[in-house]
Amino acid sequence: MRPAGRAPQQVRPLTLTRHYTKHAEGSVLVEFGDTKVLCTATVEEGVPRFLKGQGQGWITAEYGMLPRSTHSRNAREAAKGKQGGRTLEIQRLIARSLRAAVDLKKLGEFTITLDCDVLQADGGTRTASISGACVALADALNALVANGKLKANPMKGLVAAVSVGIVNGEALCDLEYVEDSAAETDMNVVMMEDGRMIEVQGTAEGEPFSHDELLALLALARGGIDTIFQAQKAALAD
């Protein structure tokens, strides 16, 4: 039995609280069970140098964990003087995922930065960041339209992500920390609302996984992500 008595295909209790902070164009507190991430979207005029004059926008991301978001305190990366490899990998994943949701040509020469700060970690922080940041991004784009800076919303659709894995021989969706740390196979899946995949990151921590197990995990992820899409739509409808 899973720690919270969840069914194998069940996502943890999910909450998306919009307008969580007052300054950012978009802000969302996303909670998957005990994992809590604050996602903010900041709009700035102009684009990176490599895009200047091309008439398109850019979406980037930063990710970080508060020192006591985990069981024991981790020093801030700023105090260490550099970001770790895990942090860089995750923020690139978040940015890639959210760029897929937007027509950058229609965005024009604006840059949107998504800041994902983990308040409390209990597994799935990168996937929670993507799912929460998507809602913050939607609010930021709506603000650009409402303020007359864009004629039409360039968002192509929602993006969501979930972790899946094999634990004690069983395929599970939305792993919490105790499951993730014991997983024989761990996978993160990012999808568009229409079912197309943006990213699949899968690793065999123990025994290699079979083709059939891969397909089963992807099907499990699709079901979990559909649940997240429903929550995103409900949050944006408020």
Swiss-Prot record:
Top-level enzyme category: transferase
Listed GO MF terms: 3'-5'-RNA exonuclease activity; tRNA binding; tRNA nucleotidyltransferase activity
Catalytic activity: tRNA(n+1) + phosphate = tRNA(n) + a ribonucleoside 5'-diphosphate
Top-level taxonomic group: Bacteria
Key words of the record: Nucleotidyltransferase, RNA-binding, rRNA processing, Transferase, tRNA processing, tRNA-binding
InterPro entries (alphabetical): ExoRNase_PH_dom1 (IPR001247), ExoRNase_PH_dom2 (IPR015847), ExoRNase_PH_dom2_sf (IPR036345), PNPase/RNase_PH_dom_sf (IPR027408), Ribosomal_Su5_D2-typ_SF (IPR020568), RNase_PH (IPR050080), RNase_PH_bac-type (IPR002381), RNase_PH_CS (IPR018336)
Residues noted as binding phosphate in the record, renumbered to the chain: 86, 124-126
CDD domains: RNase_PH_bact
Coiled coil: none
Classification via Gene3D superfamilies: GHMP Kinase, N-terminal domain
The enzyme's E.C. designation: 2.7.7.56
Pfam families from the UniProt entry: RNase_PH, RNase_PH_C
Membrane-spanning segments: none
Gene Ontology annotations of biological process type: rRNA catabolic process; rRNA processing; tRNA processing
Quaternary structure, from the entry: Homohexameric ring arranged as a trimer of dimers.
UniProt-listed HAMAP family: RNase_PH
Role of this protein: Phosphorolytic 3'-5' exoribonuclease that plays an important role in tRNA 3'-end maturation. Removes nucleotide residues following the 3'-CCA terminus of tRNAs; can also add nucleotides to the ends of RNA molecules by using nucleoside diphosphates as substrates, but this may not be physiologically important. Probably plays a role in initiation of 16S rRNA degradation (leading to ribosome degradation) during starvation.
Family according to the record: Belongs to the RNase PH family.
This protein's name: Ribonuclease PH
Protein species of origin: Serratia proteamaculans (strain 568)
